[in-house]
Amino acid sequence: MHKIEKKWQKIWQEEKAFQVSNESSKPKYYVLEMLPYPSGKIHIGHVRNYSIGDVIARFMTMQGFNVLHPMGWDAFGLPAENAAIKNNSRPQDWTYSNIEYMKKQLQSMGFAYDWTREINSCDPEYYKHEQKFFLELYDRNLVYQKESLVNWDPVDNTVLANEQVVDGRGWRSGAIIEKRYLKQWFLKITDYAEELLNEIQNLKDWPAAVRVMQEEWIGKSTGVNFHFKVKYHENTTIEVFSTKPETIFGASFIGIAFNHPIIEQLICKTPEIVNFITKCSYITRSSEIDKAEKEGIFSGLYVIHPFDANIFLPVIITNFVLMDYGTGAIFGCPAHDKRDHELAIKMNLPIKQVIETGNIQEGILINSDWLNGLTSSEAKQKVIEKFEKLGIGKRSVNYRLKDWSISRQRFWGCPIPMIHCKTCGVVPVPYKDLPVTLPDDVSFDSNYNPLEHHSSWKYVNCPKCDNSAIRETDTFDTFFESSWYFTRYCNSNAVEMTDKKACNYWLPVDKYIGGIEHAVMHLLYARFFTKLMNEHNYVSIREPFKGLFTQGMVLHATYKDENNNWLYPAEVVKKGNEFFHKENNTRVVQGRIEKMSKSKKNIIDLETIREQYSADAIRLFVLSDSPPEKDLEWSASGIEGCSRFINKLENMFEAIFSLKDDMKSEINKDLNRLIHLTIKHVADDIKTFSLNRAIARMRTLTNAIYYEISKDRIDVRTIKYGFNVLVQLLNPFIPHITEEIWQKLGNKERLYKSVFAEFDESILELSTYIMAVQVNGKLRDTYEFDVDISEDEVKQITVNLPKVQKFLAGKEPRNIILVPRKIVNIIV
């Protein structure tokens, strides 16, 4: 198989098989898998993702489409920098070496990529365009810098966006996140929150789960902002945001965020308060708040109820109010809010019911003075009107989504093209001086950004006044590069950021394939970037991905030795029902079956498996054992079965090729119908990404043809036709062996250039059908009827069948129950 695979990979390369033109009379189809980070090796999870995309690309090509199927590299990022620190090397050397190796791996798998469009995000020829675009956004006031409380990863020594903090820990390092105030660059994604939210409903070909995740992340809330006066400090107010102002008479406290400004202004920071604030600082996301136990501490302050000056509400510093949502303050109504209720129970605060049914949602107002008897919606309007009349509140819309923090305090990223001058302030780098590139001669002798200590790079003259100034030493968040790369594939050699004409032809991406873990960050940022690029005339679209498919993960068992160290599967051998270390024969503990990951070493080396089996066998296995959207458990027996199937195809070719045509033989209608049914269903299955079902159907056809070969009297013409069809249907899945067999079958045209097999609708129509014949509900016979027979004729024929007459014993049936084309039940 390896010789066959190398042969066809060479042919495809020489024939430029998968290069596509931007000029074509064919309809276009743009299929794209999320580009990989060049970490060193392609893993099986990648292979599954890329195999799914490759099936679609090859199938759509055979369907007559001009298919764009590119590949590139998301090449900036922390792993390269960490490797440089560890190995005393340069990040670019590590990155480019990995790209070279991983590209060879992808090519060895036979993926149909147009490599002429390859992009590399760490190439200055790529990132110079995003630097210019950043400056264009700055000119539109869509970029700003401010000091803000950020998520600081103490291991990676950089800031993380909220989306990059998982359960209070850094998404890569796993370190507990700290809160720090730093100057950061932001993009105003919140200016586009409403459009990003509204357009979700038009993403019909996206998984519902992803749409819901984006809706929840944007998190639109409609309510009111209003002010409470602080007791004894009546010139000072606390502004709260509420979506349920009608419950104001049930308020028993004010909850504020741990970093609310009033804490610095008026609150005496006792040791208990300081400790509580420190504890709260580890909670960075509302998803973590939902899981956390609700806690609070009395601040020492009270506020005055806006509608009753005799009611004073305690101000509680809480762990479930965030400063970056709403105003950083809420009023707590424990009777009608779960979180407020939990805190009230813990702190012994009053719980006053103000909705008659006690519902958290809606009902009739009680215990609410002038709101009594109103419905919740009526009361809400009346309260808001009162706030507005008193001048203490106004209607407001809030979003959970916050502006995108794009600054990272690391070296291996795209430099932010700004200069800091003591005289002129912040000055953009002139367009003519782009790209701002990274220096080659950096030292990684510490765990901090080496740009801070590189004097010849850091110190420059101000473009405005020519005085000494300092470059911005932060680099872009790597999601910046991956937010627009799909537009660059349309013409990766474009002089400008994009080739507008090429983008008009190819975009939007028809099918985007990747993991659901990117549902919020990457996909949201890419949607945002597309809207920005549209407004700058780089693209004509405002949504980048027409269709989205999220594949499941590849799983494998985990293993640990007696010292609790992770082991690779290749280091473990099974003896009976137990596991042992191959080298020292010590006992090994098998852990959970989990997503393949380097950290837990439960990964399969692609090169080892490919050498042992074949690229086609791997492709077939990752597509056949589970629906593509579900997780797939790696199985040695599974890939062995796929390898045997490929060998079976080769053996079938030898057997079929030697058969002599017999023009007098009767056409095998059943086999011919199965062939055409398989063509129809496989095409439908590929279109709906039911790839495992398509493979199952082709296995059924394979077995049917194999069975026919073994008969004494056979229809050679239909067998040969069916085998030709089978090879063609299998080609998008296992392209190497099918190209080889196709050629040996005497076909002149390359299989990748052929038109996908078409079915004949008339052959699918049955001329007869078989019915089960029952007497008193028990099967007594079967009978084959013509499709155009009437129900009365069916009843007449079945009653007179000898096996039925035996049970009738000369009597007339009491009733005949007919289920058309399935069952006739004669009641005696």
UniProtKB/Swiss-Prot annotation:
Keywords: Aminoacyl-tRNA synthetase, ATP-binding, Cytoplasm, Ligase, Nucleotide-binding, Protein biosynthesis
Motif mapping: 'KMSKS' region: 595-599
Pfam families: Anticodon_1 (PF08264), tRNA-synt_1 (PF00133), tRNA-synt_1_2 (PF13603), tRNA-synt_1g (PF09334)
Matching PROSITE patterns: AA_TRNA_LIGASE_I (PS00178)
Molecular function terms, GO-annotated: aminoacyl-tRNA deacylase activity; ATP binding; leucine-tRNA ligase activity
Gene Ontology CC terms, in alphabetical order: cytoplasm
Transmembrane segments: none
Localisation: Cytoplasm
A GO BP annotation: leucyl-tRNA aminoacylation
Residues noted as binding ATP in the record, renumbered to the chain: K598
Annotated motif 'HIGH' region, positions: 36-46
Catalysed conversion reaction: tRNA(Leu) + L-leucine + ATP = L-leucyl-tRNA(Leu) + AMP + diphosphate
EC number, as in UniProt: 6.1.1.4
Enzyme class: ligase
Main subcellular localisation: cytoplasm
HAMAP family associated with the record: Leu_tRNA_synth_B
Family: Belongs to the class-I aminoacyl-tRNA synthetase family.
Protein name listed in UniProt: Leucine--tRNA ligase
Organism: Rickettsia prowazekii (strain Madrid E)
Gene: leuS
